[in-house]
Amino acid sequence: QTQYYRNTISSLAGGININNIKKEHIENLQIPLCTMNQYLQYNMPGMDIPAIHYYGTDITWAEVFENTEKIARSLKALGCKEGDQVPSFLRSVPEFISLFLAAERVGASILCRMNSLKENVEAVASAGSHFMFAHDFLTVEEMNTFLSGTNVEKIILLPPCNSCDIEAMPDYVRNSLNENYTGECAHGPAIITWAEFLALGEN
């Protein structure tokens, strides 16, 4: 999988070997004149066209942008502002796309890490954020480690199947997903559900 991404990046970069970046490669980089949100809105095939197929659910471009706006409002309600880093441990789910775009609208950036717990905690601590995103299989032990080792006060939890039809998910994917639920799931006053998070932007 790693090699696939390397080949893809190399292809997008005009065949540049990302393991051997040279000075001229950096000098020739062009800074985009638009945001990712603007680029997608200019180039998407139509608002009613599905942008994401996610295990039995089609999510249109209109829904992507609508969800992006909702998340952006909720981020602002949590105090997120320009220059902030937003820690996210979400996997490849539709909500991550809208979260990424929403952070850009606010002027923030997404901090993604999938390392050891210790390394993840160090990265979140360095970001200085008082909230983070994770899936609902985050354990109580992991939650307490983040709360005690960082500035995080609130953790927004998202079920991986929030936007999918679970019956349309292949058994091997479902079994792999279930393997992530390894202990007592995080709960308590520091936890905000995804629905509660979205509701913050409605007030």
Residues covered by each model-derived region:
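AMP-dependent adenylate-forming
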Residues: 13-20, 38-60, 185-186
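Short acidic/polar active-site loop segments enriched in Thr and Asp
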Residues: 81, 130, 153
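ANL superfamily adenylate-forming
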Residues: 142-203
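Flexible, non-catalytic linker and terminal segments flanking ANL/adenylate-forming cores
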Residues: 1-34
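Conserved ATP-dependent adenylate/AMP-binding module captured primarily in the ANL superfamily
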Residues: 115-149
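Conserved AMP-binding/adenylate-forming core of the ANL superfamily
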Residues: 31, 49-101, 118-121, 190-196
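Short hydrophobic alpha-helices that are characteristic scaffold elements of the AMP-binding
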Residues: 101-110, 125-126
